[in-house]
Curated annotation (Swiss-Prot):
Expression across tissues: Highly expressed in lymphoid tissues such as spleen, lymph nodes and peripheral blood leukocytes. Weakly expressed in other tissues examined including heart, brain, fetal and adult lung, liver, skeletal muscle, kidney, pancreas, prostate, testis, ovary, small intestine, kidney and colon. In the lymphoid system, higher level expression in CD4+ T-cell subsets than in CD8+ T-cell subsets. Also weaker expression in CD19+ B-cells and monocytes.
Function according to Swiss-Prot or TrEMBL: Receptor for IL27. Requires IL6ST/GP130 to mediate signal transduction in response to IL27. This signaling system acts through STAT3 and STAT1. Acts as a receptor for the neuroprotective peptide humanin as part of a complex with IL6ST/GP130 and CNTFR. Involved in the regulation of Th1-type immune responses. Also appears to be involved in innate defense mechanisms.
Membrane topology: Single-pass type I membrane protein
Chain ranges for the short sequence motif Box 1 motif as given in the UniProt record: 554-562
GO MF term set: interleukin-27 receptor activity; transmembrane signaling receptor activity
Domain notes: The WSXWS motif appears to be necessary for proper protein folding and thereby efficient intracellular transport and cell-surface receptor binding. The box 1 motif is required for JAK interaction and/or activation.
Protein name: Interleukin-27 receptor subunit alpha
Subcellular location(s) of the protein: Membrane
Ranges that cross the membrane: 517-537
Keyword Lipid metabolism: no
Endpoints of the signal sequence: 1-32
Superkingdom field: Eukaryota
Chain positions covered by the region annotation Disordered: 587-636
């Protein structure tokens, strides 16, 4: 049909016998030997099976049958191999093939070819097995370090040459390095790896191919791991209070581990008091420093002969030769810290900057070494915001160490998490409360302290606050009002003010002047009244009044209420009569006594009744001396 689109030639139904002439036509369109395409076939080893694999071709999918036609021995014989559904490869047993044969291979689905056939030469188109590496590895005895890896080629006819290539990499590195040149199996030479580092782990593996098949490489060999000879640590440093005040944590001698892929044993020597000490059981990578040690030396067990020992002087130099003006700052958009300082008066060999997170053990110390001309260091690492890091700069010279005072650095300061704890001190002066507070833990302060804020609240009145210097931790409060009072303190950094600490509750007495003077006035007034009373009681003018006002047992010389004479008949003393004079005569009529009524019963004698009450009366005129002596009576 004119203008119609013709179907592909392999979709037309053809009888089986008609396929043979067509394949000879398609042979002109076969892919070159070894070229990549939908179908690839190769032999595995000199006596292995023939492996064929393919990729699905669009909507046509995978073949259901694979056809192999001999082109060298029986050109008219075609061998068909069934393919399981869903598989993308098939293995043809070696027993079904002829040695050194040349095959034409294609795949069909429902009797229709899916792709052009490929040409396979069984004599050359083979993948060798993987080579065998090690386990012996030899190392050179001088610098630079070289390693010689022994290996064996895969099983192969002795007259046929294989080309093998090897790759190596350092432990924990991602990229592999190709060793040049490629090696041949005839003659067989070992694998040599140059410019290696001591106390380092390496990995190596390889693969082989036939000499004429440049792109048909065999399988990779298993990876061989090996370790170069151990060496003394290059970087040794001190952690802890080596040159500070004795009594703290014991300092440690630290060195950096060679890496997780290497196992090294170490030996340490210290020079103490003119003799050498070598502690046993040294683990990686620290050792306690004995008191008074002057220098330390570290070496690795079974180290190479040309590797020198690592020495470090432990003598503490005067602080005047230490670096000065150490400052720490953060870098915007970076997780690193910048440390700067000014040099001391000496000429150091190098500067060492070490740092550790607050609260970390001595073993977790980091440090970097810098040339003597460097006066700044960019500390690597992922520093956390709000976390304090102790940073120390030390000048290292041949005579010893001179360390500057440690400083605390922050990548970014934050507001404190807690407030200080308050407690009351002894009043100074009495009546004036004094308080003190503790420091906020550094990891909760989260920055450099700028000041404290002290707040007080009495009753329902609003709180009153005042700022206190960060160097002050105790104050007296003379102006607090009397009554109940609450106190609290907050800490502040440049990032802001933190929450208040625990509240201290006080109850203050009234300390105003009137309440201080009134008790004194009352006391003096009481003394005045008491003095007046005593003076009146003891003076002659009022002496006789005590008999009338006070009980007898009070004014008796020896007061004794139990033995008082108040219960006995009282005999009044009458003053003597005055001499007779011209006094008026008073006529007195004598009255007869009333008659006595006799009772039938005799009168009973009654004892005087003592009720305990003493009768006292006002003095009579005679007692007061207001009247003259009585006149004699004149009887009418």
């Amino acid at each position: 049909m004119r203008g119609g689109r013709g179907a592909p030639f392999w979709l037309w139904p053809l009888p089986k016998l008609a396929l043979l002439p067509l394949l000879w036509v398609l042979f002109q369109r076969t892919r070159p030997q070894g070229s990549a395409g939908p179908l690839q076939c190769y032999g595995v080893g000199p006596l292995g099976d023939l492996n064929c694999s393919w990729e699905p071709l669009g909507d046509l999918g995978a073949p259901s049958e694979l056809h192999l036609q001999s082109q060298k021995y029986r050109s008219n014989k075609t061998q068909t191999v069934a393919v399981a559904a869903g598989r993308s490869w098939v293995a043809i047993p070696r027993e079904q093939l002829t040695m050194s044969d040349k095959l034409l291979v294609w795949g069909t689905k429902a009797g229709q070819p899916l792709w052009p056939p490929v040409f396979v030469n069984l004599e050359t188109q083979m993948k060798p097995n993987a080579p065998r590496l090690g386990p012996d590895v030899d190392f050179s005895e001088d610098d630079p370090l070289e390693a010689t890896v022994h290996w064996a080629p895969p099983t192969w006819p002795s007259h046929k040459v294989l080309i093998c290539q090897f790759h190596y990499r350092r432990c924990q590195e991602a990229a592999w390095t190709l060793l040049e040149p490629e090696l041949k199996t005839i003659p067989l030479t070992p694998v040599e790896i140059q410019d290696l580092e001591l106390a380092t782990g390496y990995k190596v593996y390889g693969r082989c191919r036939m000499e004429k098949e440049e792109d048909l490489w065999g399988e990779w060999s298993p990876i061989l791991s090996f370790q170069t000879p151990p060496s003394a640590p290059k970087d040794v440093w001190v952690s802890g209070n080596l040159c500070g005040t004795p009594g703290g944590e014991e300092p440690l001698l630290l060195w950096k581990a060679p890496g997780p892929c290497v196992q090294v044993s170490y030996k340490v020597w210290f020079w103490v008091g003119g003799r050498e000490l070598s502690p046993e059981g040294i683990t990686c990578c620290c050792s306690l420093i004995p008191s008074g040690a002057e220098w330390a030396r570290v070496s690795a067990v079974n180290a190479t002969s040309w590797e020198p020992l690592t020495n470090l002087s432990l003598v503490c130099l005067d602080s005047a030769s230490a670096p000065r003006s150490v400052a720490v700052s953060s870098i915007a958009g970076s997780t690193e810290l910048l440390v700067t300082w000014q040099p001391g008066p000496g000429e150091p060999l190098e500067h060492v900057v070490d740092w550790a997170r607050d609260g970390d053990p001595l073993e977790k110390l980091n440090w970097v070494r810098l040339p003597p001309g460097n006066l700044s260091a960019l500390l690597p690492g992922n520093f956390t915001v709000g976390v304090p890091y102790r940073i120390t700069v030390t000048a290292v010279s041949a005579s010893g160490l001179a360390s500057a005072s440690s400083v605390w650095g922050f990548r970014e300061e934050l507001a404190p998490l807690v407030g200080p704890t308050l407690w009351r001190l002894q009043d100074a002066p009495p009546g004036t409360p004094a308080i003190a507070w503790g420091e906020v833990p550094r990891h909760q302060l989260r920055g450099h302290l700028t000041h404290y804020t002290l707040c007080a609240q009495s009753g329902t009145s609003p709180s009153v606050c005042m700022n206190v210097s960060g160097n002050t931790q105790s104050v007296t409060l003379p102006d607090l009002p009397w009554g109940p009072c609450e106190l609290w303190v907050t800490a502040s950094t440049i990032a802001g003010q933190g929450p208040p600490g625990p509240i201290l509750r006080l109850h203050l007495p009234d300390n105003t002047l009137r309440w201080k003077v009134l008790p004194g006035i009352l006391f003096l007034w009481g003394l005045f009244l008491l003095g007046c009373g005593l003076s009146l009681a003891t003076s002659g003018r009022c002496y006789h009044l005590r008999h009338k006002v006070l009980p007898r047992w009070v004014w008796e010389k020896v007061p004794d209420p139990a033995n008082s004479s108040s219960g006995q008949p009282h005999m009044e003393q009458v003053p003597e009569a005055q001499p007779l004079g011209d006094l008026p005569i008073l006529e007195v009529e004598e009255m007869e006594p009333p008659p006595v009524m006799e009772s039938s019963q005799p009168a009973q004698a009654t004892a005087p009744l003592d009720s305990g009450y003493e009768k006292h009366f006002l003095p009579t005129p005679e007692e007061l001396g207001l009247l003259g002596p009585p006149r004699p009576q004149v009887l009418a």
